[in-house]
């Protein structure tokens, strides 16, 4: 007889970590490996921001923003962010969208609506959620919590490579400085500071390939849920 799961809800794997730690790529591949749903929580805020711009909803119109967020048709598939079934992965990285995301996130009802949308991604057969507070705030009962990190030098090198491959100019020293400043802000903020959950497994990817990181997360999950 197969053992029963040691929890009563749909399993969730959370993968948190600082910027450029590789958590998004690893989360997408872990989800694909296990056949789980995927949540890119950072992209969710930008998707809401993009939709508000498309529908010309003002950043201060809280009621309209909350209704918009409740009605959004959002999916994450193979690392792509889709709005109403259309890939908008590139569009949500625009500076205008980032600025709007920051502007709407200051409203508590908007943040609450986005938290509810994040939790709604929890569906059978399971969910892999990546972000900064997935294990500490959003899915505190996750069966596996992973906190991914890497040296700031390794993260800057990865970000530099990504930008160059996409045709953007990039300066490694500027990237190093930006990452250090962002790490400081994220770790010191009052609301949901960036930190590992008390029961998280730490995964330093400084010297690991993407495949090695994915394999480690899958092994951890299968050890916790042997019949998965």
From Swiss-Prot:
Domain of life here?
Bacteria
Reaction(s) catalysed by this chain's protein: CMP + ATP = CDP + ADP; dCMP + ATP = dCDP + ADP
Gene Ontology biological process terms, A to Z: pyrimidine nucleotide metabolic process
Sorted alphabetically, which InterPro entries does this protein's record hold?
Answer: Cytidylate_kin (IPR003136), Cytidylate_kinase_dom (IPR011994), P-loop_NTPase (IPR027417)
Q: Name one Pfam family in it.
A: Cytidylate_kin
Where along this sequence does the record place binding of ATP? 17-25
What the entry lists under SUPFAM superfamilies is as follows: P-loop containing nucleoside triphosphate hydrolases
NCBIfam families, sorted: cmk (TIGR00017)
Q: What is this protein called?
A: Cytidylate kinase
């Amino acid at each position: 007889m197969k053992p029963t799961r040691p929890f009563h809800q749909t399993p969730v794997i959370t993968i948190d970590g600082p910027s450029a730690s590789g958590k998004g790529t690893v989360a997408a591949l872990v989800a694909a490996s296990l056949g789980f749903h995927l949540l890119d929580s950072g992209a969710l805020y930008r998707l809401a921001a993009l939709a508000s711009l498309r529908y010309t909803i003002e950043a201060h119109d809280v009621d309209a923003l909350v209704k918009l967020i409740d009605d959004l048709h959002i999916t994450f598939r193979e690392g792509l962010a889709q709005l109403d079934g259309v890939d908008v992965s590139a569009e949500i990285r625009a500076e205008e969208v980032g600025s709007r995301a920051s502007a709407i996130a200051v409203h508590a009802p908007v943040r609450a609506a986005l938290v509810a949308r994040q939790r709604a991604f929890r569906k059978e057969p399971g969910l892999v959620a990546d972000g900064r507070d997935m294990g500490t705030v959003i899915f505190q009962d996750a069966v596996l919590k992973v906190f991914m990190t890497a040296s700031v030098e390794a993260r800057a090198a990865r970000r530099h490579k990504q930008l160059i491959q996409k045709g953007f100019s990039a300066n490694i020293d500027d990237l190093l400085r930006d990452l250090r400043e962002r790490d400081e802000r994220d770790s010191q903020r009052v609301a949901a500071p960036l930190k590992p959950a008390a029961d998280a497994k730490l995964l330093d990817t400084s010297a690991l390939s993407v495949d090695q990181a994915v394999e480690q997360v899958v092994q951890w999950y299968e050890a916790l849920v042997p019949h998965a």
